[in-house]
Design a protein with these regions (language model features):
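Non-catalytic, C-terminal membrane-associated alpha-helical segments of glycosyltransferases
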Residues: 201-208, 218-301
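Acidic helix N-cap motif at the loop->helix transition within catalytic regions
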Residues: 14-18, 41-49, 92
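Conserved donor NDP-sugar-binding/catalytic core segment of glycosyltransferases
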Residues: 88-120
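Cell-envelope/extracellular polymer assembly enzymes that use nucleotide-activated donors
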Residues: 2-4, 31, 167
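Glycine-rich, basic loop-to-helix element that forms the pyrophosphate-binding segment
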Residues: 45, 58-75, 96
């Protein structure tokens, strides 16, 4: 197995160093590719000063899927792993990855543990059955693909600002590529998030949800029901925050407008993308769609 590890980053200097240190220790011999968005925190200088990075690709786009695809393009391994810049791979990570791909799986993932006051918590693999298709979701910052699977997918869909990993899970299911789960392929997240969303982020979330469901399955009752179910449950939860005094009615209404607008845009754009790529890979905005992602490239191989 020739392993390449792609680390997409944007203003992640504070945590990226620990990510790279762990890869050097726990995945020795792996080709390491850092795909850096338009960072303003000195990430490029920090990476150039290290001797354990093989390729640094700079991209001008802030979208995570663009950085992922730029890194995948630069990688040469027959297995390509994606590791988030805020994750530290654990002991035995590489061995668990190799073991999973030695079987029938073409993709493998594992838990991403978060530091919380009560200790470390890990997500279990999430599986759903949608329109007769069994979908296994994966952790986008802790996943490895055989090159053949990535080629069949044409990488990630660059239309998506968020939800790129979930979209890819739907497309893997359509292409009949199994996804393995290995608890030993674990990574640890040292930095948490605030858990909140702005009105604009609500819009992006629901544009992504509507887009990927419509693109992958078309407009059908199952799709409509899932979109409305998600939106309805979160509308009720946010309304309760207003009642408790944790939010204000204007914020609730503003978020609601963004959600409705995001759904409308996502449905429309999903239909266009579905028509543009009628193959099971459903990726009109993949790696092969453009070759101008990188604005600079440093190759020390």
């Amino acid at each position: 197995m020739e392993l390449s590890v792609v680390v997409p980053t944007l203003n992640g200097r504070d945590s990226l160093g620990a990510t790279l240190d762990a890869l050097a220790e726990r995945a020795p011999g792996a080709e390491v590719v850092v795909a850096n968005g338009p960072s303003t925190d000195g990430t490029t200088g920090m990476v150039r000063g290290r001797d354990d990075v093989d390729v640094l690709v700079k991209v001008s786009d802030r979208t995570l899927n663009v950085a992922r695809n730029a890194g995948i393009e630069a990688a040469t391994g027959d297995v390509v792993a994606l590791v988030g810049h805020d994750l530290v791979v654990g002991e035995g990570w590489k061995e668990a990855l190799r073991d999973a791909l030695a079987g029938d799986a073409a993709v493998t993932t594992g838990p991403a543990r978060s530091r919380v006051s009560g200790g470390a918590t890990a997500e279990e693999p999430e599986r759903r059955r949608i329109a007769g298709r069994s979908v296994t979701y994966f952790e986008g910052g802790n996943v490895a693909f055989e090159r053949a699977a990535l080629d069949a997918l044409d990488g990630f869909d660059e239309y998506l600002e968020t939800g790129g990993a979930r979209d890819t899970a739907h497309r893997l299911a359509a292409l009949d590529y199994p996804v393995a789960w290995r608890s030993g392929m674990s990574a640890r997240r040292e930095y948490g998030t605030d858990g909140g969303r702005t009105a604009a982020e609500w819009g992006r979330k629901y544009r992504s949800l509507a887009y990927r469901l419509v693109k992958n399955y078309g407009v059908r009752p199952t799709v409509v029901r899932r979109i409305l179910s998600h939106a309805g449950s979160e509308a009720v939860a946010n309304a309760r925050e207003v009642v408790r005094g944790d939010s204000v009615p204007t914020a609730w209404l503003g978020s609601g407008r963004r959600v409705v607008g995001g759904i409308a845009t996502g449905v429309s754009d999903g239909l266009v993308s579905r028509a543009r790529d009628r193959t099971p890979r459903r990726n009109p905005h993949g790696i092969s769609d453009r070759h101008d992602r990188a604005v600079a490239r440093y190759d020390w191989r």
